[in-house]
Amino acid sequence: LEGNVRGTGVHACGTIICRDDITDWVPVSTADDKETGEKMLVTQYEGSVIEDTGLIKMDFLGLKTLSIIKDAVANVKHTKGISIDIDTIDIDDPTTYKLYCDGGTVGTFQFESPGMQKYLRELKPSTFEDLIAMNALYRPGPMDYIPDFIDRKHGRKPIEYDIPIMEKYLKDTYGITVYQEQVMLLSRLLADFTRGESDTLRKAMGKKLKDKLDALKPKFIKGGIKNGHDKDVLEKIWADWEKFASYAFNKSHAT
């Protein structure tokens, strides 16, 4: 069924930005706002292709956790007379890491499920990078890599790189490709992809565009060979990236 349109819908937080009257650029229809009942203008083009028309799509998200933090800061000020600047909280606080190591994360956004708590107790996170990686890995597909990630962190399995220079971008994740940004950087390092080409690779992975991935492969292999890398190793790396595309996640979002 993938790729076939079954019905229409409205993204909960997707907003299209246009410098002119939007009807000069794309066809529009109307839909009812579920909260207010008001009529909204909705593009008839699907979100994945709307930017090809020259428009910008932004997702503006609300998060209840942020409201809870705001209320907590206000309560501390009211009851204790202490002013807390949430933007300067120490991300290396030992007491906080102990909570994560103990799986004491109930009420913590993205870290409160029983499964995540179990893996946190096994991982014993010691750096902010560990937490970012767990956030990215704890989803269907990449979850299979979590045991390896944990074993490599604690030295129970060796950290290996297909090509030694890949350590530059895979060191923080113990040799496992976790983020789209790592693939972007590695494509430039290994095969001299331009910034634009590496971003095209990221988009192709994020949106699972097999045709675009297939079109980029010969350039990667050719560029890698030119830089002195073994063709068979390059083929393996690309095959790993193709599997990675099924769950590719960007680091900025995980952070």
Specify the residue positions occupied by each region the protein language model found:
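Mg2+-dependent phosphoryl-transfer active-site scaffold
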Residues: 1-248, 254
